[in-house]
Amino acid sequence: MDLKQYVSEVQDWPKEGVDFKDITTIMDNGEAYGYATDQIVEFAREKEVDIVVGPEARGFIIGCPVAYSMGIGFAPVRKEGKLPREVIRYEYDLEYGTNVLTMHKDAIKPGQRVLITDDLLATGGTIEATIKLVEELGGIVVGIAFIIELKYLHGIDKLDGYDVLSLISYDE
């Protein structure tokens, strides 16, 4: 299935000059959403994944159906102040400022094989931070899966040494 046909492109959103790739049109088509999920599940099975991790919010949308299909758990990565129990945190730089991601301290057991999921790979900052959290807890990142990769932003460079699946790629 050509998933690219289900992606909506929105010009100048969220700001002028940005060509936004909207995956909600994949999600609202059961066949396309199921196909995308199945492709990631196949990748995860090959990696013998124990748990799926995803950053809010679209990492949840991609990762939860994968975890459910495999009969394994899902661990959320959230912005600071959104998780109720004891957390670890990772602060990283944005173009203008910083961001902090957190994860429950007991979300990953040492040695667990982890698949990280998100909707889109752009600059790679969010996924790089997610990797740091997983590895701090002793998890082993065995795969990272995206619906879309924006190759022209070179986010993949931050994921060197990790096995990455992107279902759709945009070169420009």
From Swiss-Prot:
UniProt protein name: Adenine phosphoribosyltransferase
Function, as annotated: Catalyzes a salvage reaction resulting in the formation of AMP, that is energically less costly than de novo synthesis.
One Gene Ontology term from the biological process aspect of the record: purine ribonucleoside salvage
E.C. no: 2.4.2.7
GO MF assignments: adenine binding; adenine phosphoribosyltransferase activity; AMP binding
Entry's family note: Belongs to the purine/pyrimidine phosphoribosyltransferase family.
Pfam families: Pribosyltran
Xref: InterPro entries: Ade_phspho_trans (IPR005764), PRibTrfase_dom (IPR000836), PRTase-like (IPR029057), UPRTase/APRTase (IPR050054)
Catalytic activity entry: AMP + diphosphate = 5-phospho-alpha-D-ribose 1-diphosphate + adenine
HAMAP family: Aden_phosphoribosyltr
Database matches in PANTHER family: ADENINE PHOSPHORIBOSYLTRANSFERASE
GO cellular component: cytoplasm
Enzyme class: transferase
Gene3D superfamilies in the cross-refs: 3.40.50.2020
Subunit field text: Homodimer.
Pathway field: Purine metabolism; AMP biosynthesis via salvage pathway; AMP from adenine: step 1/1
